[in-house]
């Protein structure tokens, strides 16, 4: 015969895995082609010069250079890669 009442089971304890979204390379950081700069849902950041955008809106570098962020007058933030000059590379 049981001497303790059976405990109820909790119906909580489920959650989805985090998607690790956000900025991966900040302004001034050096990137090489293929480096992911921003992972996002939708276009919180927009692609500028020397960057591409994947089908999931991921912004990635197309050339080697420094990452820059620029806000236009309409409030949109554009991510660009400023290529390294020949003198700076030597």
Curated annotation (Swiss-Prot):
PROSITE patterns referenced in this protein's UniProt entry, alphabetically: RIBOSOMAL_L27
Quote the gene name from the UniProt entry: rpmA
Among its keywords, does the record have Hydrolase?
no
* MF terms in GO: structural constituent of ribosome
Record's superkingdom? Bacteria
**Any single Pfam family the record assigns to this protein:** Ribosomal_L27
Q: Does the keyword Ribonucleoprotein apply?
A: yes
A GO biological-process term:
translation
Q: Region labeled Disordered — which residues?
A: 1-22
Example of a GO cellular component annotation carried by this entry = cytosolic large ribosomal subunit
Q: What is this protein called?
A: Large ribosomal subunit protein bL27
Q: Which family does it belong to?
A: Belongs to the bacterial ribosomal protein bL27 family.
Keyword annotations of the record: Ribonucleoprotein, Ribosomal protein
């Amino acid at each position: 015969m049981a001497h303790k009442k059976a405990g109820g089971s909790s119906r909580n304890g489920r959650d989805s895995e985090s998607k690790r979204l956000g900025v991966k390379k900040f302004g001034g950081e050096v990137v090489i082609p293929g480096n992911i700069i921003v992972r996002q849902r939708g276009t919180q950041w927009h692609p500028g010069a020397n960057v591409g955008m994947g089908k999931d809106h991921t912004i990635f570098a197309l050339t080697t250079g420094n990452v820059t962020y620029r806000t236009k007058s309409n409030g949109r933030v554009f991510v660009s890669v400023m290529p390294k000059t020949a003198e700076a590379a030597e």
